[in-house]
UniProtKB/Swiss-Prot annotation:
Function statement: Catalyzes the transfer of a methyl group from 5-methyltetrahydrofolate to homocysteine resulting in methionine formation.
CDD domains named in the record: CIMS_C_terminal_like, CIMS_N_terminal_like
Residues binding 5-methyltetrahydropteroyltri-L-glutamate, per UniProt: 18, 116, 521-522, 567
Recorded name of the encoding gene: MS1
Source organism per UniProt: Arabidopsis thaliana
Protein name (Swiss-Prot/TrEMBL): 5-methyltetrahydropteroyltriglutamate--homocysteine methyltransferase 1
Free-text cofactor note: Binds 2 Zn(2+) ions per subunit.
Pathway entry: Amino-acid biosynthesis; L-methionine biosynthesis via de novo pathway; L-methionine from L-homocysteine (MetE route): step 1/1
GO molecular function, one term: methionine synthase activity
Active site, per annotation: 701
Amino acid sequence: MASHIVGYPRMGPKRELKFALESFWDGKSTAEDLQKVSADLRSSIWKQMSAAGTKFIPSNTFAHYDQVLDTTAMLGAVPPRYGYTGGEIGLDVYFSMARGNASVPAMEMTKWFDTNYHYIVPELGPEVNFSYASHKAVNEYKEAKALGVDTVPVLVGPVSYLLLSKAAKGVDKSFELLSLLPKILPIYKEVITELKAAGATWIQLDEPVLVMDLEGQKLQAFTGAYAELESTLSGLNVLVETYFADIPAEAYKTLTSLKGVTAFGFDLVRGTKTLDLVKAGFPEGKYLFAGVVDGRNIWANDFAASLSTLQALEGIVGKDKLVVSTSCSLLHTAVDLINETKLDDEIKSWLAFAAQKVVEVNALAKALAGQKDEALFSANAAALASRRSSPRVTNEGVQKAAAALKGSDHRRATNVSARLDAQQKKLNLPILPTTTIGSFPQTVELRRVRREYKAKKVSEEDYVKAIKEEIKKVVDLQEELDIDVLVHGEPERNDMVEYFGEQLSGFAFTANGWVQSYGSRCVKPPVIYGDVSRPKAMTVFWSAMAQSMTSRPMKGMLTGPVTILNWSFVRNDQPRHETCYQIALAIKDEVEDLEKGGIGVIQIDEAALREGLPLRKSEHAFYLDWAVHSFRITNCGVQDSTQIHTHMCYSHFNDIIHSIIDMDADVITIENSRSDEKLLSVFREGVKYGAGIGPGVYDIHSPRIPSSEEIADRVNKMLAVLEQNILWVNPDCGLKTRKYTEVKPALKNMVDAAKLIRSQLASAK
């Protein structure tokens, strides 16, 4: 019985790749140094999978930034602004596309389906001159082979690649991305031919868009593309891998009829209905790669349940055609539980990170083949039983409070325009008020103080003194820049979710449970293992201290319940919305305590609201209903004169704008600087928005400092579709990852731009 892993985390168990990348970007190390760290990581991953008994080990799932960007490089689809002139694409062009450089901005970055991973969106048009410009897939296959490991090279499939792309600026609206298939397929053929020549016997093509709602023409593109590739694929075993959801019946029919394809991979964790399709009919003689081990969470697999699913499938496809797999790439989970030396033993027994999931996949494959590891299986059953019965998981008071929410929709008593009038009387802000999103740069010194305080090497008194000084520095800087609504800079916070989770019951924390978000940026999601409540106030002390340093309004900064949920590893023993309502009640207590503590502007970030949106339209309404309701619960108890802000990230808002309005926030700030036009088009098309809105005026993800003219131009474009009395001027996200040398001039230019336009508007009256 064979085993397979869809993909594996790249960062390394101690984030080795992150530090190597950042050292290279800062000019402190060479390309050779970076390549050595990368090669060592790849080698250890392949050897680890091989040692565990994995038959189908992936290669080319490693990336220095992103696998879609790797595909863009493979196809030579470099936008003209990066000055690429042909030949093998080097790190300079590659990283310029990902991060921008001193003279040109980065390509757009967006969520990878409904995960917290981001990919770099290809910019395509009829003029793109495709060429085979990165031999990475072949090189990595050969690299593994030289180490004695035969791998399955993984490529982003051609149809998914095009459907995940966008039309470049200036391309005619009638342009169809799929019209480029005849141009990219010859390059796929070259790559596949080279892989065959290098000795590959299997190839994996990831076509995750098959789980989306695709109309007939898009499904036909799959049929046509694979018919075109058939002769090149001949002689290879070809796995088409899907993940993240059920595959719709029509797409299943299309997929299982593709020419040249010998194996199909399905997510059977999130895709429970796919099982019914397989049971109703699976093509004879083909392989089924059964994704029964969850690639997106950290809970130990239920061996008994998985084994029973696999045995049922074995009866349909046959023993020699069933392969045990992960539900998706393990990129979306933490790397290795072995590094968690401080985690509570009971909770630890309930978990499995990527390295443990490799063991789980192989244990299930062996059990199916009649070589069951009895000790491992009984330990698994004991851990599951302990989790089900542990008193740490259930809190009756929380269960009752959450149950009492049913039947009410928790809205503020007054409508938004009346509230904004009450708030303006109190805050007295100019038109186009300026603010920032919350965090300010975190210096090495600041991180050291936090780390030492956590390790009890610094007294509480010294810690408070250091944080107070940092807050004072941030407040003084904002006053000097003449920003209207201030923030305290969040120097006490390591992460916008972890900080709250550490103070809520029902959460556990890892030391090294890092997951890649984009590029070198990793997040360490908390683990929600039980009912959630707030034992005491979490942010009031610091926010009140910051407000005492200035006469200007100071924003209290909270992370919203939906974002805490979507950026955590969430318990899988109750529906997600029930956990979300519990978090909402805890945040509601905090909002009301901030108001009592004299904070008149409170921001409740829902950066991740959209990313939790199910992939299929039929499931959107239910999700949006409970997500928006959770947000309203947090602030339904405050006075009209308290201004509630929210912030959202990387969102394609067009499809959820009515839900955003229904959140009923007083002001919404949006991270949109890489997707300007998309956002403004929503308002251009006549959506009436009565609350305050601050579309980000510059991109904080790039080191580039925008000029005041550029920012003013952006604000003017916004004023063409938004009323001047509702527009706010702000960066598109928090400034934590930037340096002060970048932040000061950028914010100065932002304030100058706002003042310039204010004076233009005043003189135009």
